[in-house]
């Protein structure tokens, strides 16, 4: 059942469009629950034995699994269908946005003018958008996060609705569930922590910004992103939801905020969409921006080091097939070591993990042999 919150900025599908979106959601749910496990069955029944016959041992890592699994017709069928279903998500949403485009822009302009919640939007037309944002359409989303027209805001509703369909609603009616998982990690790592100034890096449409204001109503909450089109939508969306937050067009690698300006510097699924050069800069900037006693908390994709080789192989599908171009590096990276290389002291950085159930594992390698989100924590 489609339970996404129908706020004023969300594109309204007609019956035909809604039927297509329902079909795509159902297809992906079927693939996740029924077809994807078939890959493991094929591996156990056939593929690992083929590898062992040639090498005298079982595959030791995901790359060795890939060398044989990619030849399996079942995997090829599943992978092709997975790719098509991802494209179908965006196709099913773009029809609605194309039809509703003028009304959405009018609503955004009206809400921004009325500014009922009292939030702010600050854009910088001279800010360069990094190549890692524009080089490929991340997640196959047409136009990527930045889009082709900064004065428009079509990438916002495309992302908002598309993300909900992509996740099958698993992150809640407002696509904000990951923040609540991260809040649980913070409670485990620093009990009683109550930040008064919060920075959400790579906020996109503000679905990871708005919940921080709800969790800490007295805090000043700021979301930054390099995409003007996403931020226009984020501001209108937050105002429509009645949540006063500030949105600023800025690059997380080097912001214009003063040293020690925030008590919490956070992100949700930002790091794996950057680059090898950008990551240490973001981690160093996070440290510079923290006040004494502040916390850095970056929530990101599951690590594969603790997974069995066939699990790690399947968990890595999006790297090659969904334009997640930096994910293959960050999934195997020692993030605390990367933070130390960016200037963080060794004794203040940790890498807990959190499952979708909310279970928190203080050390990433303490997590069970299942896919868990990873979190990089640093305490100033």
Could you describe each region identified by the protein language model?
Residues 242-254:
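Conserved SAM-binding strand-loop segment of SAM-dependent methyltransferases
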Residues 227-229:
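Conserved SAM/SAH-binding beta-strand->alpha-helix loop
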Residues 194-204:
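Conserved class I S-adenosyl-L-methionine
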Residues 205-217:
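Conserved SAM-binding loop of SAM-dependent methyltransferases across substrates and taxa
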Residues 280-292:
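A short glycine-rich, Lys/Arg-flanked "PGG" loop and its adjoining helix->strand segment in the class I
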Residues 253-265:
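A short acidic, Gly/Pro-enriched loop at the edge of an enzyme's catalytic core
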Residues 5-20, 24-29, 52-151:
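N-terminal auxiliary segments of SAM/dcSAM-dependent transferases
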Residues 297-359:
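C-terminal alpha-helical "lid/dimerization" subdomain adjacent to the S-adenosyl-L-methionine
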């Amino acid at each position: 059942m489609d339970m996404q919150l129908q706020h004023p900025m969300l594109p309204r599908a007609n019956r035909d469009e809604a039927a297509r979106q329902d079909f795509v959601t159902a297809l992906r749910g079927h693939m996740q629950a029924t077809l994807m496990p078939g890959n493991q069955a094929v591996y156990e029944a056939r593929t690992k034995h083929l590898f062992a016959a040639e090498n005298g041992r079982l595959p030791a890592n995901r790359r060795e699994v890939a060398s044989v699994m990619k030849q399996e017709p079942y995997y090829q069928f599943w992978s092709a269908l997975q790719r098509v279903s991802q494209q179908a998500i965006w196709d099913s949403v773009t029809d609605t946005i194309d039809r509703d485009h003028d009304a959405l822009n009018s609503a955004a302009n009206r809400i921004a003018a009325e500014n009922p919640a009292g939030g702010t939007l600050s854009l910088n037309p001279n800010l360069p958008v990094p190549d890692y944002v524009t080089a490929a359409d991340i997640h196959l989303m047409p136009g990527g996060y930045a889009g082709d027209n900064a004065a428009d805001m079509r990438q916002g509703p495309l992302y908002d609705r598309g993300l909900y369909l992509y996740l099958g609603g698993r992150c809640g009616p407002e696509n904000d569930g990951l923040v609540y998982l991260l809040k649980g990690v913070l409670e485990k790592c620093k009990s009683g922590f109550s930040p008064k100034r919060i920075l959400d890096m790579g906020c996109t449409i503000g679905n990871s910004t708005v919940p921080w204001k709800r969790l800490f109503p007295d805090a000043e909450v700021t979301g930054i992103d390099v995409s003007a089109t996403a931020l226009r939508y984020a501001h209108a969306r937050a105002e429509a939801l009645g949540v006063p937050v500030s949105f600023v067009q800025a690059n997380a690698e080097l912001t214009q905020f003063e040293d020690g300006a925030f008590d919490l510097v956070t992100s949700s699924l930002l790091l794996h969409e950057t680059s090898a050069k950008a990551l240490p800069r973001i981690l160093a900037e996070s440290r510079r921006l923290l006040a004494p006693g502040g916390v850095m908390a970056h929530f990101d994709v599951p690590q594969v080091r603790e997974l069995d080789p066939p699990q790690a192989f399947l968990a890595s599908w999006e790297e090659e097939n969904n334009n997640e171009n930096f994910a293959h590096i960050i999934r195997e990276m020692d993030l605390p070591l990367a933070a130390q290389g960016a200037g963080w002291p060794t004794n203040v950085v940790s890498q807990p993990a959190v499952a979708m159930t909310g279970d928190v594992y203080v050390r990433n390698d303490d997590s069970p042999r299942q896919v868990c989100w990873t979190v990089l924590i640093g305490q100033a």
